[in-house]
Each structure stands twice: as C-alpha cells, then as structure tokens.
Amino acid sequence: MGDWSFLGEFLEEVHKHSTVVGKVWLTVLFIFRMLVLGTAAGPLWGDEQSDFMCDTQQPGCENVCYDKAFPISHVRFWVLQIIFVSTPSLVYMGHAMHTVRMEEKRKMKEAEREAQEMKNSGDTYYQQKCPVAEKTELSCWDESGGKIILRGSLLNTYVYSILIRTAMEIAFIVGQYILYGIFLETLYICQRAPCPHPVNCYVSRPTEKNVFIIFMLAVAVLSLFLSLAELYHLGWKKAKERCSRAYKPSPSTAPRRLESAPQVERAQMYTPPPDFNQCLASPNGKFISPFSNKMASQQNTANFATERVHSQEDAAGEGPFMKSSYMESPEVASECAAPALPESYFNEKRRFSKASRASSKARSDDLSV
C-alpha cells in the first residue's frame, strides 16, 4: 500500500493547530481510514483480477469484462479519496507554518532593534542580561481555557479548507455510488466485444468485500458529518462573540465616580518636598496651611489697627504719639506664619510714611524715645 509516514507527519502538525471537532476528524482519518485501509483492504483486494473468472474461452473477453465491472479498484479509489480530502488540511498547515515563521521574523527584528537602541543608550545591565535576541517558538493563537482561537486570514484559510474537504467527501461518496453502487453482486453479466455473447462473470469473496465497502462508506459519512459540525461550531462561536461584543457596555457609559477614584489614590501617594513640613508646622504643634483663615484674620486686624491709629491721630494730635515706646516683636518659629502684633501698637500715634503705611513691621530708622 506504500509508505504513509510522510502524510502522517503533516497531518500530525495539522492536529496541533485544529479545533476540538477538527481533532476528532483527524483521528477518524488516521485510525478508520488510513490504518484500516493499509492493513485490511490491501490483502482483501490483492487477488481481485486473478480471481475474477468468466465462463468463456474467448481471448480478451475476461479482461474487458473486468474493466467494465471495475473501472477503478476500490482500494485505489479510497486512496485517492484520502489524498484529496487531506489536501485542504495540508494547504492550511502550510499557511499556518508560513504565518508562524513571519511572526517569528517580526519578533526577532523588534528584539534586535530594541537591543540596538539599548546598546546605543549605553545600558550595561541590558547588555549583560540580554546580549543577543534568542529565537523562540511563537504561536498565532491565544489559548484561553485550553481552546485555540483562530483569527484573521488563518481563520479564513481554515474555513475554506473545511468547505473544500466537505465538497470532496460528497463528490467521492456520489462517485462511488455511481461506479459500483452500494453492494457488489456475486454474478456479473458482461456484454462487451470481443465477447461473442453475454458472459457470466463471478466476483471473488463478495460478502467480505461488501462488509468492507459499507464500513468505508460509513466512515466517509461520519467524516462529512464532522466537517459540517466543525463549520457549525466555528460559525456559532463567532456569532456568539459578536453578540457578546455588541451587548457589552462601552467604557464611555461607565459612571464617572468610578474613574475619579484611582486619581485620588494616586494623588495621596505623592510625597511632599523636604521643606514642606516647615511651612506647615505651627507653634502649637498643628499642621496648618500657609494661606489659612487665621493668617487672613491677622492681616485684617492689622489693617483695622492702622485705620484706628489714623483716626486717633487726627483727633488728638502728635504729642502722645512721641511718648509711646515701640517694642520688637518676638521671633516666630514658623517661617510662613504671620508675626504677632506688639502690645503697644494699638496706642501708638506715630505718623506712618507713605512707603510704610501698608506694612506693620519695624524699620531700622524708626525713632525710639
């Protein structure tokens, strides 16, 4: 029957990159077709022509009757059926291997470009850890839960291969029925030149051959059913994915409060600068903002005191103002806190200059009586 190892190796590679139904179909092809055909069908049909006997002595009549009864041997017909049915899967395997190689080359180029960029930037750690980009086996499918997801042109090639092998199965089943029918007859009447009259011819082991023919027809029908089931499986799976994608809510419709939550957490993770605590420390040991309401209240008090001094100066004159004493304000622990007002500031009648009218701090040229 020949060596089937070459075809078997290719079909093993196809088995790695097939769906669940496709793996069952390949198992049926291996066990119930190739194995049975190679072990049982060969010896059964080996003596077919030699045991085909006709009751005539006319030279050549027996040969032309056998040619009319069996235009092609059953075994050779089934071998052609296996080859034609397996060819679409082999084409798909070639496309898959080509896609894998192209993906490997693309990944290799990206790794080499990244290595060159890191080398130019002078990253010694990257040069020590990743000196050369290694070639790794990549896959064009994502495995989630043990299932293989086909995409893009690879999915189209896989679907076309299933359609072609389904058409081949139907064609060979119909062709076998047209050539031989369903069962072999024990007696075959031949009317063909150079036979001078109708000749009776006899087929060897017709019952055993009929059992084998029925078995091969059943396997062909099973393979056809598996191909249709695989098409339905792929179609239902893709339709389900599209429906789930259509009913899936878009990110724009999500509540905004959920989006702002991570931003608050990110803001809390930022650390302040080193000198930030000095501006927040107050004499009482509490943390206040440098622009708090207390500081604004002190500034308003200073402005009110300045206006009060002006009003008292207009009423009483400049005499009492020269008798007042001015005391320096104590140092403030915080650099950002507002200085405290002196106790005698509210009784002071000294006229302020235009430059110092807006400020309450003591100057170096102020008089002290």
Curated annotation (Swiss-Prot):
Extracellular topological domain residue ranges: 41-76, 191-210
Keyword terms: Cell junction, Cell membrane, Gap junction, Membrane, Transmembrane, Transmembrane helix
InterPro entries per record: Connexin (IPR000500), Connexin40 (IPR002264), Connexin_C (IPR034634), Connexin_CCC (IPR019570), Connexin_CS (IPR017990), Connexin_N (IPR013092), Connexin_N_sf (IPR038359), Cx40_C (IPR031862)
GO BP terms in the entry: atrial cardiac muscle cell to AV node cell communication by electrical coupling; cell-cell signaling; heart development
Membrane topology: Multi-pass membrane protein
One Pfam family from the record: Connexin
Similarity comment: family membership: Belongs to the connexin family. Alpha-type (group II) subfamily.
Function per UniProt: One gap junction consists of a cluster of closely packed pairs of transmembrane channels, the connexons, through which materials of low MW diffuse from one cell to a neighboring cell.
Protein name: Gap junction alpha-5 protein
